[in-house]
Amino acid sequence: FNNTRSDILVQRNASVPLYTGLSLPRENIGETVNRGVDWSVNFSETSREFKYNLGFNLTYAQSEVIFRDEAANIPEWQKSTGKAVDSWVVYETNGIYRTQAEVDNSAHFSGAKPGDLWVKDTDKDGSITSNDRVRIPQSATPKIAYGIPMKAEYKRISIDLLWTGQSMAKQMILPQAQGSIVSPPTWLYNDRYTADNPNSKYPVAFNDTDPRNNIAADFWLRDASFFRLKSLEVSYVLPEKMLSRFGILNMRFYAGGTNLFSIDNMKQYNLDPETNNTTGVNYPQTRIYRVGVNISL
């Protein structure tokens, strides 16, 4: 597929400076394109007492900005034209400063010290500013999504499963983006930089006002791929001979659930790979267990 959207209603808030004081109307100027492919295959087989069905579907999709209003003076490496619609704009990093010598011998934010993020000087001007941010190809929207439906029946017993997954997506794990109402998580606190832990995984302790660590940086991006058991149901139908004496045509018992199992890298951060939850307002996937009986009279 190749789906082009044009005449998208947007304001010229980027190219018109704020100091004009203008409240701009929406114009039909935006344009994007989504390219990709959908593919599916299904196989089934039936015998006298056993039958099964196995399927696989996959979608690869890549969005691209054709035109978006952008400021004329932003660096080329920050422009969204030609990139994914929701591509990340981040500071690139070399990890964490471990020594004062590393701070002294590199461009850095004012007040930088060992334990802070080591931000790259992208424009090579000897200082770290907003111009050093880079728009990267990755986004929170996966380029690959797939599903594997499976069903099998043997006599009166059946099982129905749906596996889902995604790949080629990045999520921001920076918890302080949620503001001061959110306490730092234990994973960030326990492995933070200290004098006794100079080889820590994460920077020094910081809050939501920290200008050196509480920033959108590639250091905080993680692979949001997952493989999940989206739904499962096991059922059993009672024999008709047993039910006929009670005037019942059919009785089916079932048990199952949704969101039962997942393989992903986001559990350690208490985040859902399907939810880009940097603000804390998105509710994660709900796990549901259910049992019941269907009766036909």
Residue ranges and their predicted role:
Residues 1-2, 35-45, 52-60, 146-152, ...:
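Membrane-embedded beta-strands that build the outer-membrane beta-barrel scaffold
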Residues 8-13, 53, 60-79, 168-193, ...:
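Outer-membrane beta-barrel and related beta-rich outer-membrane complex signature
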Residues 13-23, 123-131, 204-217, 267-275:
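Flexible, solvent-exposed coil segments and beta strand-coil junctions
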Residues 22, 26-34, 76-102, 191, ...:
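C-terminal beta-signal and terminal closure region of outer-membrane beta-barrel proteins
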Residues 25-29, 44, 134-138, 219-224, ...:
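Outer-membrane beta-barrel proteins
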Residues 26-29, 74-88, 136-147, 151, ...:
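C-terminal extracellular loops and terminal segments
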Residues 27-33, 46-140, 265:
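Conserved small-residue
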Residues 112, 166-252, 257:
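Extracytoplasmic gating/loop element in the C-terminal half of outer-membrane beta-barrel translocons
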